């Protein structure tokens, strides 16, 4: 899901080694060293709205460096994944750097070992290739839905390839006999010069990197003489560019209409596998068109592979993104594989299940995703992220599809899930299914799965006390798997909940394993998770499961009804404190959201009789000591947050305020049903009075009107701003005069734009204002920034 965060890539500045692009640096004197200087502001990947601040900081640093350390030479410039520079200078002068303005840290250079020369071996891919690469993906087509692919890169050398009949397709100047499709899916009205091009050397690094992992040519020489290969090195590549530069001014993004169009084109072009290393917060899955399109692609015989997301460090469990929630897709988490003997460890950024709203068990599998070397335009780079893990699985799927053309998409998925091997979690324990699904893919085992399972994994969802539920797993012979298998339920170390999984002792394949989950009256809340193991002699196959024993304490409140939109006054003072945690996601402190709310709650019930685009609340005023904040939940249950939208944080990647605190909570594309908003606080001392606005179905932007086209010198330009739905979002306001960003203040329905420093005469004002609903929108809305109004007018000063 988009800017780099939503593209689910974590790239470390010191890892990036791009051949042919590095600026010239000269060694100055003896004892020259190269270090990395980090400046005060966070990088764009963490704070996308701070581009101007970062640019100003960097300019100030370079000016000061030239004056105070004239022997220093700037090499790499970092903005996306770090804010700073690499600097070469005499070792004796390094201490001078810490005294320069804006310097936060000075780090020594570090050397990292690229891994794409090892990761195919780590998942067992070369064993399937054959001595002449006859079964290395020959004839398979992998569609890369991403930011574009550099077809001229040596990793995609077309020598020895003949395109299939009817290919190449699309923008043929960006195709070869290896990269056989080049299409772009830009949003309507995109004005960036490269928006309509299937490849842009400045913005196609991510897609080129992903494509190389999936299907880069075997035995290609990369940085430092490393010899690298993609997982399915003889497969063809289809380039379906959806991440394009947008008018929002932020990093490339894609909305659902463009992504769905790309999926449809990939299916129409006959791709065997689709890889989508992007994502965003989950919405109601029955209304998630991208997830539904991937399910449809699977039904059409195309294997959909999706990155699980990179949000675990930020928001904890329940962070798997859309469209990794697609039921039929292979959602992929990331692991780091290192050491001798090798050890597989869950990557600390890799999103952990369940899915946020649908509570599905995802990811399905895991694959290498840390420090992976692959192609980028003009050279090579090492990136980390589930974006890098997913194409390992896409390549693996292509290998299996070539070797087993009779397998269905569901059978191929089962072969990878049921044969996975364990990774470790951050505590050194065997990782639970929420971290790795069936485990790290192991291609030699997946090539001979013995049995196919349907479903491949089980989510029990939320389990109430004094309840039981039943289900079944269909097992079929995949070749050599017929006969009696022993069955056992093995719980993970993190499975702390009370409850019992009841299984038969054995199963005769083909056949059905029936199960029952029983939760007693006094069961302890927590996760009920592990594997249903199938054993026959030395053979082991397994089906992952997850559920959570949960108590809906919020339902014990006497809730008030919100029957119509409007402005309300309320207080939490004197109310019961029944709930301290809300989920999912479970631990959003990494994005500045309070995780434990020990104060009292005031609860309002909301009943939706029909489908709407959205609804929500925003706190517009608090009492002097009040620290109340909102949480939106479904079914009046604190265990059913309406996803990221239910938290008081802006999560629209097109806004500069992305992941900033906002006193609003809501739901995007909700189904009819019962919801509740809980007003809560971190402590009892934070209880107090507050005023809030409640809206339903806000799909229109604010209204803006220039008050006067003539403004006295040094006086502000004034624009009336109003919004009858969610209300004007003051922090969203961006104003420029003649292209220069200027201060703007919203008060009493007026936006006042500073004209200080501008000469008398005619000027051009561009004012962008969003409402609070915009802070909750994602790429799943049909248009970019539908709740934002941009006013462009001329005025005369003086």
Task: State each model region's role.
Residues 23-115:
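Inhibitory N-terminal propeptides of secreted protease zymogens
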Residues 30, 130-255, 269-272, 299-301, ...:
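Subtilisin-like serine protease catalytic core
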Residues 75-77, 82, 95-160, 189-192, ...:
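Protease zymogen maturation seam
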Residues 136-138, 239-328, 355-360, 374-391, ...:
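Substrate-binding/access-modulating region of protease and related hydrolase catalytic domains
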Residues 173-191, 324-398:
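Extracellular S/T/G-rich loop segment that most often corresponds to the catalytic His/Ser-adjacent loop
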Residues 211-215, 219, 242-243, 272, ...:
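Hydrolase catalytic cores
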Residues 493, 589-651:
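Acidic, Ser/Thr/Pro-rich low-complexity intrinsically disordered segments
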Residues 535, 550-578, 604, 632-645, ...:
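C-terminal edge strands of extracellular/lumenal beta-sandwich accessory domains
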């Amino acid at each position: 899901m988009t800017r780099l965060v939503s593209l689910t890539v974590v790239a470390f500045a010191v890892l990036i080694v791009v051949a042919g692009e590095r600026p010239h640096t000269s060694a100055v004197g003896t004892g020259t060293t190269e270090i990395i200087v980090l400046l005060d502001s966070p990088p764009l990947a963490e704070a996308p709205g701070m581009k101007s601040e970062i640019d100003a900081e960097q300019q100030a640093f370079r000016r000061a460096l030239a004056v105070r350390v004239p022997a220093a030479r700037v090499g790499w410039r970092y903005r996306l994944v770090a804010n700073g520079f690499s600097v070469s200078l005499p070792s004796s002068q390094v201490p001078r750097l810490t005294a320069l303005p804006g310097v936060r840290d000075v780090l020594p250079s570090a050397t990292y070992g690229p891994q794409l020369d090892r990761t195919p071996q780590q998942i067992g891919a070369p064993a399937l290739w054959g001595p002449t690469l006859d079964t290395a993906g020959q004839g398979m087509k992998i569609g890369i839905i991403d930011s574009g692919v550099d077809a001229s890169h040596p990793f995609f050398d077309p020598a020895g390839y003949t395109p299939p009949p009817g290919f190449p397709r699309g923008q043929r100047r960006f195709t070869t006999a290896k990269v056989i499709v080049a299409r772009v899916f830009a949003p309507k009205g995109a004005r960036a010069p490269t928006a309509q091009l299937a490849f842009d050397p400045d913005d196609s690094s991510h897609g080129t990197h992903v494509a190389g992992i999936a299907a880069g040519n075997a035995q290609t020489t990369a940085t430092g003489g490393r010899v690298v290969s993609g997982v399915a090195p003889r497969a063809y590549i289809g380039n379906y560019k959806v991440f394009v530069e947008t008018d929002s001014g932020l990093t490339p993004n894609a909305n659902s209409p463009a992504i769905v169009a790309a999926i449809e084109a990939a299916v129409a072009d006959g791709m065997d596998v689709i890889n989508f290393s992007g994502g965003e917060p989950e919405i109601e899955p029955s209304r998630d068109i991208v997830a539904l399109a991937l399910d449809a692609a699977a039904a059409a015989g195309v294997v959909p592979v999706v990155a699980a997301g990179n949000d675990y460090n930020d928001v904890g469990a329940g962070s798997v993104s859309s469209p990794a929630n697609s039921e039929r897709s292979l959602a992929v988490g990331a692991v780091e594989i290192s050491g001798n003997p090798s050890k597989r460890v869950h990557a600390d950024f890799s999103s952990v299940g369940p899915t946020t709203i649908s509570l599905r068990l995802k990811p399905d599998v895991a694959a290498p995703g840390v420090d992976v070397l692959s192609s980028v335009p003009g050279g090579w780079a090492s990136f980390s992220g589930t974006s890098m893990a997913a194409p390992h699985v896409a390549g693996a799927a292509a290998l299996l599809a070539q070797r087993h053309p009779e397998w269905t998409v569901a059978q191929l998925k089962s072969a990878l899930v049921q044969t996975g091997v364990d990774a470790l979690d951050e505590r050194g324990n065997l990782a639970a299914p929420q971290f790795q699904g069936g485990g790290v893919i192991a291609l030699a085992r997946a090539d001979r799965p013995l049995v196919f399972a349907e479903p491949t994994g089980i989510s029990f969802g939320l389990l109430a006390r004094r309840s039981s539920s039943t289900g079944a797993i269909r097992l079929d012979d995949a070749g050599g798997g017929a006969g009696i298998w022993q069955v056992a339920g093995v719980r993970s170390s993190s499975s702390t909940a009370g409850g019992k999984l009841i299984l038969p002792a054995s199963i005769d394949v083909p056949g059905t394993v029936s199960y029952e989950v029983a939760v007693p009256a006094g069961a302890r809340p927590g996760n009920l998770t592990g594997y249903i193991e199938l054993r026959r002699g030395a053979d082991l196959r397994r089906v992952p499961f997850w559920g959570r024993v949960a108590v809906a304490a919020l339902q014990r409140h006497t809730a008030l009804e919100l029957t119509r939109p409007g402005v309300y006054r309320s207080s939490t003072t004197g109310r019961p404190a029944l709930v301290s945690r809300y989920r999912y996601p479970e631990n959003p402190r990494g994005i500045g959201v309070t995780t434990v709310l020990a104060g009292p709650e005031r609860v309002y019930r909301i009943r939706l009789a029909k489908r709407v685009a959205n609804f929500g609340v925003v706190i517009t005023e608090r009492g002097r000591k009040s620290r109340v904040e909102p949480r939106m939940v479904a079914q009046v249950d604190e265990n059913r947050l309406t996803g990221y939208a239910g938290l008081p944080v802006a999560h629209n990647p097109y806004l500069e305020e992305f992941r900033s605190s906002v006193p609003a909570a809501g739901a995007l594309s909700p189904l009819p049903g019962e919801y509740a908003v809980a007003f809560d606080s971190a402590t009892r001392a934070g209880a107090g009075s507050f005023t809030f606005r409640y809206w339903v179905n806000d799909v229109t932007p604010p209204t803006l009107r220039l008050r006067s086209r003539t403004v006295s010198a040094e006086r502000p330009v004034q624009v009336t701003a109003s919004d009858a739905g969610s209300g004007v979002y003051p922090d969203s306001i961006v104003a420029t005069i003649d292209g220069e960003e200027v201060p703007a203040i919203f008060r009493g329905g007026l936006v006042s734009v500073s004209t200080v420093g501008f000469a008398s005469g005619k000027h051009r004002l561009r004012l962008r204002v969003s409402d609070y609903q915009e802070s909750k929108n994602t790429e799943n809305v049909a248009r970019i920034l539908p709740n934002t109004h941009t006013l462009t007018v001329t005025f005369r000063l003086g």
